[in-house]
Amino acid sequence: MAAHHRQNTAGRRKVQVSYVIRDEVEKYNRNGVNALQLDPALNRLFTAGRDSIIRIWSVNQHKQDPYIASMEHHTDWVNDIVLCCNGKTLISASSDTTVKVWNAHKGFCMSTLRTHKDYVKALAYAKDKELVASAGLDRQIFLWDVNTLTALTASNNTVTTSSLSGNKDSIYSLAMNQLGTIIVSGSTEKVLRVWDPRTCAKLMKLKGHTDNVKALLLNRDGTQCLSGSSDGTIRLWSLGQQRCIATYRVHDEGVWALQVNDAFTHVYSGGRDRKIYCTDLRNPDIRVLICEEKAPVLKMELDRSADPPPAIWVATTKSTVNKWTLKGIHNFRASGDYDNDCTNPITPLCTQPDQVIKGGASIIQCHILNDKRHLLTKDTNNNVAYWDVLKACKVEDLGKVDFEDEIKKRFKMVYVPNWFSVDLKTGMLTITLDESDCFAAWVSAKDAGFSSPDGSDPKLNLGGLLLQALLEYWPRTHVNPIDEEENEVNHVNGEQENRVQKGNGYFQVPPHTPVIFGEAGGRTLFRLLCRDSGGETESMLLNETVPQWVIDITVDKNMPKFNKIPFYLQPHASSGAKTLKKDRLSASDMLQVRKVMEHVYEKIINLDNESQTTSSSNNEKPGEQEKEEDIAVLAEEKIELLCQDQVLDPNMDLRTVKHFIWKSGGDLTLHYRQKST
């Protein structure tokens, strides 16, 4: 089975455009941390986050700032990572459905494997064979030769993989022994399935758990397996006997993470109950409560620089990662100060972590304001912020203020159609544009706060402007207004660059903004930074990936049509006027009420007046000498427009009237009457 780097699926599947509003450098984990890997040789810790970013940290406690670098290429949660090749290569698995191969020392992505069709949840590594396995919600397990993966190039970009079939449910955990002779998977099927990766042969199925199997470990020779489950138990299995040989009921809730010492005598466990225990596998009654975290435990990593392990790193659903000392833990059996009764809580061995890698805040709440341009967000520290979706930036930090009060404070009686969606899954703002509604929102340049060079007030399409800004650096979108002959002269003189028109002419987005082209189902096709779209490789991939609906706007400059709104215009019952024939009118949904008032004054009221006058005024028609602005003034002085018996503000547009006042099905109906003098 071949897994290719890229597949040109843009023409076959519905493609959306997303971007992330964020700082250029995101030093801190912004959400829970799903996976950890320790490189003891370089004193480095790798954290894989729900914010889609893999970060590298120094574990040297003398270093004031532990942050080293970020590894960014994924677009969704990174669920697992493994260090290979003595720490030179990192493999990552993500909910964006990809497996990525990284240069761990330099921090860049070398290749992307797109074989999985759904979230990739788990990896397993056979150190002696440099073999990695990946598995996920598509129920597939793929085997990868790491040396082959690291040799991939732009021209040599196809890799062959073996697959293990037979899983009936989504896979959440995976383990392979160091020798690469046994692989075990855990799933929502509640069983352990075992294969021989050398032949891809199914060996056995182990039953016993009553819920999802979330964590798996194998000993070196592949004869014993440890499993942790959402059913709250840890089980020790003999693969030779094909049965469970011990069950450890250590936790009050689900067990999500396991680590074991090299001798396979002590298991370290953590999970939903936030507690981390060390249990002696030979004597289940001996278990030590090491510490209690502030959130459910997602992953643990033993410091194996000495035997017994001196410390354990712990990641949780919060963004902070802690290191807890294990010194003195193996003296507990002699002292008798251990927990042999789960119903009798004991004091943790550690009350404070030995080292802390601080995390950042995660956005957990969002409200789109009525102008459909600005957002209010609230994060895990209860800080509220104000954002500009159009310019892809934070406008203001408001601090710890009342979120609902801020929403009320910023309410405006204005209606703009929805044209984007917001996702907070990574803890940052991800904005998605879809062909179905991206071009729904038109506003006037004045209302958007933009000035036109000629002083006019053109109508602007928010989605169109944003797409042009996101792809501003892509040469294919550039427009050169000069003719070819002049172009050649200016090219020689070095003036051409200054004459090329880029972007939308009104604003730019931050150049570091990540832009993501992905299928509507969630699969990522291509991710790049705004500023990189001018690169040769990036331009080529954009040509393959950008959907036609985006090309129409950014390259061909074909702006979408205005939205029309149908409505009826009738005299108000109080005017005593005869009801006219019910003609269905149509106008731009941005048309202001005052323009309808002018129409009423000029085309209806004046005509009525004309029919009631004699021809004694030299046949001069009322309004013939009036200027256009005079009509506008007179219309506001003499005419009222109503909807649902509510007098309308002349500054309102028709879409706002329909949304806030009409509030009914069917076409909008407006009534007019002359103001009483």
From Swiss-Prot:
Top-level lineage group: Eukaryota
InterPro entries, per the entry: G-protein_beta_WD-40_rep, WD40/YVTN_repeat-like_dom_sf, WD40_repeat_CS, WD40_repeat_dom_sf, WD40_rpt, WDR48, WDR48/Bun107
Subcellular location: Nucleus; Cytoplasm; Lysosome; Late endosome
Low complexity biased stretches: 609-620
Gene Ontology cellular component terms for the protein in this record: late endosome; lysosome; nucleus
Described function: Regulator of deubiquitinating complexes, which acts as a strong activator of USP1, USP12 and USP46. Enhances the USP1-mediated deubiquitination of FANCD2; USP1 being almost inactive by itself. Activates deubiquitination by increasing the catalytic turnover without increasing the affinity of deubiquitinating enzymes for the substrate. Also activates deubiquitinating activity of complexes containing USP12. Docks at the distal end of the USP12 fingers domain and induces a cascade of structural changes leading to the activation of the enzyme.
Protein name listed in UniProt: WD repeat-containing protein 48
High-level lineage: Eukaryota, Metazoa, Chordata, Craniata, Vertebrata
